Amino acid sequence: MLRSFFLLLTLVLGFDSPALADDMPPDVLARTTTQEVLLILKQDKEMQNGNQTKVYQLVEAKILPNFDFNRMTQLAVGKHWPRATAKQKQSLVTEFRNLLVRTYSRALTEFSNQTIEFKPMTIKPEDTDVTVHSEIRQPGGQPIPIDYSMYKTAFGWKVYDVTIDNVSLVTNYRASFSSTIRQSGIDGLIKTLATQSARGTDKPAPRPGS
């Protein structure tokens, strides 16, 4: 299951877009605003007790705006993307997004005592695609490295892939998506994503050892 994978993802991708975020380096944006989300999680007893409405609102407001779901879905679908119709592409993006919303929301309710350390990095003015490095530290456990693949857009930096402990989110989903498409076609993948989202499962991309 991807539950622990997405818990880590949620903790470090929960950075909202404050004023002037468009001009803020990606590592600074992540480091400074992650603290806001961690504070909310620690103080909001309703979310800690599983209030899904509030959790969904937090995910929608502070986590998902930092993703480029179109690019992420295109990369996850891979070689099958060009032969999908415009309607199928939109459905794939929508259903993939819905699945991640539910997965992130469940992960938020499992937040406990993890802390985050962002690694120093140097970004040149001309850089448009970077990797932000960080570590999740857990009491009694080894640090877990997390890398964020981000690119610069007209609306600030966006995440298009995350690698946790050498496991790429996009690559994981690509393998699962490709298998489903071979068996059931693109419409079959859309149906599978919708079904998994509706029942709240994160089965499409099992993490090794989880």
Language-model regions: role of each:
Residues 15, 138-140, 154:
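Short loop/turn positions at the edges of beta-strands in beta-sheet-rich folds
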Residues 102-144, 196-210:
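Surface-exposed, charged secondary-structure patches
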Residues 161-210:
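Low-complexity, intrinsically disordered terminal/linker segments enriched in charged
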Residues 15-21:
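Sec/Tat signal peptide C-region and signal peptidase I cleavage site
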Residues 81, 98-99, 123, 137-138, ...:
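Solvent-exposed loop/turn segments at secondary-structure junctions
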Residues 4-13:
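Sec-dependent N-terminal signal peptides
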Residues 143-171:
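Short beta-strand edge/turn micro-motifs at domain boundaries
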Residues 23-104:
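Early exported N-terminus immediately downstream of N-terminal targeting peptides
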